[in-house]
């Protein structure tokens, strides 16, 4: 018996070593450029439009500027940047982002993260953490060109990118996080960055692609319904590296966090509410400059979109009050406040 136990123990040790030394997905390190080629705002808008035309996008998924005053197109005291979540584009936050920008007289940049909105069934095949981060950095740079101060709004993985930016840019005036992706509900995604992660995912998914069949056609226009598993590996890599207590402590800006939670049976089923709440407590933001609000009527992970949310009014009102009372944004009336 002792000899058998020794043999079994040895076999398990060999298997464990084989697993630990197994292949991990490697990303090429080639940071994309984030600097803006132009400073003139009208030319900047044209440059964005021309770049988006070449990207191979589904209709109406382009990144764009929504001007506080489209007849003048000038810099405003405050601009807003919206960063959508994994696989989504600007409609994921519509109409909340537009209503907030209009209410406060802000130029608004609706960003499109790297490889989002593509027509290609291989969307995300070329996505890397460096490219994902660079697209967020570029969005912030555009926001700075549009306003003297910048408020960044992010949903889900866009919230993750918003926190990433906040950790590195203390000059950001404020943060709005809707259902931020700190960890996904399904713990299996954590295997994506472990040894044999890509191989395991291919076996589970029976291939290299994820297909989503639950979206109605109008929503599917603004969300990817088929994408390469490399996107999930990129997402989990970002979560592993940047959604940590040490990184959260670097965030000092005023912060609003909204999420769907009614009770244990009725809550966000996509990203972890528990992880969000833990992150909230670990922020470097002072208690009087941050606010968390559960929206039990939202009913869905995406709480700020007309496609999904059951409580758009509640989400808008709570966010508007925070921006007014905590960040001290001033609503406009009549003529728009511009620089």
Q: How should these model regions be labeled?
A:
Residues 153-162:
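Gly/Ala-rich beta-loop-alpha elbow adjacent to hydrolase catalytic centers
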Residues 32-62, 180-247, 293-295, 303-315:
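The alpha/beta-hydrolase serine catalytic core
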Residues 58-113:
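Short, surface-exposed "cap/lid" segments of acyl-processing enzymes
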Residues 5-21:
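Hydrophobic membrane-insertion alpha-helices, especially the h-region
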Residues 112-117, 181, 298:
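Short beta-to-alpha linker loops that shape the active-site pocket of alpha/beta-hydrolase fold enzymes
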Residues 68-74, 220-299, 313-324, 330, ...:
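Serine-hydrolase catalytic core
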Residues 118-146:
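Catalytic nucleophile-loop/oxyanion-hole region of alpha/beta-hydrolase
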């Amino acid at each position: 018996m002792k000899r058998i136990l020794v043999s079994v123990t040895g076999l398990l040790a060999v298997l464990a070593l084989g697993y630990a030394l197994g292949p991990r997905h490697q990303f090429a390190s080639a940071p994309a450029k984030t600097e803006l080629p132009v400073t003139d705002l009208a030319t900047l808008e044209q440059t964005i439009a021309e770049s988006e035309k070449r990207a191979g996008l589904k209709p109406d998924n382009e990144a764009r500027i929504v001007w506080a005053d489209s007849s003048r197109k000038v810099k405003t005291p405050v601009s807003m940047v919206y960063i959508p979540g994994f696989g989504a584009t600007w409609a994921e936050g519509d109409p909340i982002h537009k209503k907030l920008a209009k209410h406060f007289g802000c130029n608004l940049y609706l960003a499109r993260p790297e490889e989002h909105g593509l027509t290609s069934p291989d969307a995300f095949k070329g996505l890397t953490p460096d490219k994902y981060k660079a697209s967020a950095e570029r969005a912030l740079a555009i926001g700075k060109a549009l306003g003297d101060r910048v408020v960044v709004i992010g949903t889900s993985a866009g919230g993750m990118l918003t926190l990433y930016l906040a950790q590195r840019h203390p000059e950001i005036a404020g943060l709005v996080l809707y259902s931020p992706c700190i960890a996904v509900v399904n713990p299996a995604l954590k295997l994506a960055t472990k040894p044999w992660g890509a191989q395991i995912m291919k076996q589970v998914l029976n291939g290299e692609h994820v297909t989503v069949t639950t979206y109605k056609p109008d929503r599917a226009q603004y969300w990817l319904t088929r994408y390469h598993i490399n996107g999930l590996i990129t997402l989990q890599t970002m979560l592993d590296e940047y959604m940590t207590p040490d990184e959260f402590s670097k965030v000092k800006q005023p912060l609003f966090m909204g999420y769907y939670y009614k009770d244990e049976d009725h809550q966000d089923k996509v990203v972890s509410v528990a992880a969000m709440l833990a992150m909230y407590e670990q922020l470097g933001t002072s208690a009087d400059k941050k606010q968390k609000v559960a929206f039990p009527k939202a009913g869905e992970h995406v709480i700020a979109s007309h496609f999904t949310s059951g409580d758009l009014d509640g989400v808008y009102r709570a966010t508007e009050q925070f921006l007014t009372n905590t960040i001290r944004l001033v609503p406009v009336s009549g003529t728009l406040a511009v620089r």
